[in-house]
Curated annotation (Swiss-Prot):
The keyword Acyltransferase does not apply. Induction: By progesterone. This is Progesterone-induced-blocking factor 1. Residues 712-757 are annotated as: Disordered. Residues 1-419 are annotated as: Mediates modulation of Th2 dominant cytokine production. Residues 742-751 have a biased composition (Basic and acidic residues). Plays a role in ciliogenesis. It is found in: Cytoplasm, Cytoskeleton, Microtubule organizing center, Centrosome; Cytoplasm; Secreted. Expressed at highest levels in testis. Moderate expression is detected in spleen, thymus, prostate, ovary, small intestine, and colon. Expressed in the first trimester pregnancy decidua. Localized to extravillous cytotrophoblast (at protein level). Also found in syncytiotrophoblast and part of the villous cytotrophoblast. Isoform 1 is expressed in first trimester and term villous trophoblast; trophoblast cells can additionally express other isoforms. Overexpressed in solid tumors from stomach and uterus and in cells from ovary, cervical, breast, lymphoma and leukemia cancer. Isoform 1 interacts with PCM1, BBS4 and CEP63. Interacts with IL4R. Interacts with CFAP53. Residues 271-363 are annotated as: Required for interaction with PCM1.
Amino acid sequence: MSRKISKESKKVNISSSLESEDISLETTVPTDDISSSEEREGKVRITRQLIERKELLHNIQLLKIELSQKTMMIDNLKVDYLTKIEELEEKLNDALHQKQLLTLRLDNQLAFQQKDASKYQELMKQEMETILLRQKQLEETNLQLREKAGDVRRNLRDFELTEEQYIKLKAFPEDQLSIPEYVSVRFYELVNPLRKEICELQVKKNILAEELSTNKNQLKQLTETYEEDRKNYSEVQIRCQRLALELADTKQLIQQGDYRQENYDKVKSERDALEQEVIELRRKHEILEASHMIQTKERSELSKEVVTLEQTVTLLQKDKEYLNRQNMELSVRCAHEEDRLERLQAQLEESKKAREEMYEKYVASRDHYKTEYENKLHDELEQIRLKTNQEIDQLRNASREMYERENRNLREARDNAVAEKERAVMAEKDALEKHDQLLDRYRELQLSTESKVTEFLHQSKLKSFESERVQLLQEETARNLTQCQLECEKYQKKLEVLTKEFYSLQASSEKRITELQAQNSEHQARLDIYEKLEKELDEIIMQTAEIENEDEAERVLFSYGYGANVPTTAKRRLKQSVHLARRVLQLEKQNSLILKDLEHRKDQVTQLSQELDRANSLLNQTQQPYRYLIESVRQRDSKIDSLTESIAQLEKDVSNLNKEKSALLQTKNQMALDLEQLLNHREELAAMKQILVKMHSKHSENSLLLTKTEPKHVTENQKSKTLNVPKEHEDNIFTPKPTLFTKKEAPEWSKKQKMKT
């Protein structure tokens, strides 16, 4: 609004100055013909008109000065804007040049990339062709390998060998063997030791089962004897206690009569004093217990607080480390931001300095133009004064000529003034339009600068928001990290506890394993001895079974100590006899089968001989080429028959092997279950071990001593595990407890016995 008012005032001043200039032009016109009668009136008019004219001239000169100043300002603005326009044009030219360079670079890069792409496509095509060729080759090799695998599968149906076949094949080197022969050899090498082991394990299992049954029977007998002895011992102990109590009661009754009479008063006073002491001690005890409870509670609370404080200290240490890391990171960021801020401040100071320099230049130019204007004004005023003085003189001299000239030239002057006024108005309008255009440009530039400033402010706000968001994310991550650290510590503690438990369990298990291994080694040594004895007996019996004469068989048996006290069982003898009977039956079956095979083979031989005769007769009758074909067909038929028979036999063998394998697996699983059951019955085995040791050490003694000593040892072991028996009961020697003289009444059972007596 202030700018608009100043513009309007300037317009008014300019118009007034132009009007005054027109008037001054009218007054300056000289007059030649003036009458003498109007001289006095003309003097008065001339003086007024001169004053007005001088004022108008002064105003016009002021307006001219202002107009010159404004023109100078406009010229300066034009120069500034022209320089800015030139700079912008230079920037535009630079940008266009850069654009052209970038387009050229882009075209070059596109050309290079197209060349590279074409080369890469060619390489890919070549690689694809090579890959396809390789794929075809691999497919062909795959088909060949599949055919070979099919042949190998067909050949690998029957790979079970006898010992003779294995020995024959083993004699050949591995390179000369075919794949099915090599596989059958390897299968025999792997399966044969397993079969032997299974047989041995079955034998061991049977032996252990027999021993277990015998040990169980012995254990039952020993437990029965132990229970009987324990019952007898408890009855004797109860009787002894009753007798000791009766003796103590009788002694008390004897001594009470004399003692009460002599020391009744002393005992009563002592009792009262002791009762008072007991009451005081109880009070003190209650007070101390209460204080002890309070102290224990305080101690537990303090221990809890100490634990919590230790946890807080550890957490604070970790927080401190984390905060130190964050502080270091933030300090680095702060240093970067400070460097950036210093750069921006330096740029801002440079811009301020440039602004101040421009302002100083503007002020200096304004002062310079002001001084020049004042000097010009002073010179013009002096010139005006001189002119006014000269004109006054001229007016005094030519006052008469004034009115005539004025009257003559008034109309012409008016016309000229109007024309000049119109010209001035047009010039003013042009100047105002240019001024408005410049103002519009100035405003546009100002708006563009303001928009840029707002954009920069908006960017700074966005960056501040992003920094706040990053800080929030950092805080959340810090919280999550602390929680994770706490969980880690908990899991570490749990892991330490579990590792301690694991090590303790491992140590206990190792101890137990060593004990069991020692026991197992002892049992194994004994079992080996028994097995050797039984094997010797089996060999002797088998030798006697092979001998046909009974007398010679009895001699062999007696020579090896038959009839002596060899530690064998009835079950073992039954097994041996059953084994011999089975062998006899097997031999009979084999004999009958061999006879049947012989008869069948004889029949086959007769049939084949007949067929051979017929075929030979036919062949002799036929011509040569047909004979050759028939022989080839016969050979093929014979080969086919032999191959089919061998295939059938091999399939049967495979099925038998599968059955044997399943049976062996079942026996293996059963043995594993039996072993687990035996391991579960460790306590029974330990007791059996002790019994066997005692039996071995005291084998020469009588059976009565064994029955007495063994329950003692068993009872001692069980007492050491379960009960803590006092020393008075050791070695069946009872030492009664010391008698205590009390003022209590006798028990009821002693009173009843007294009443009965």
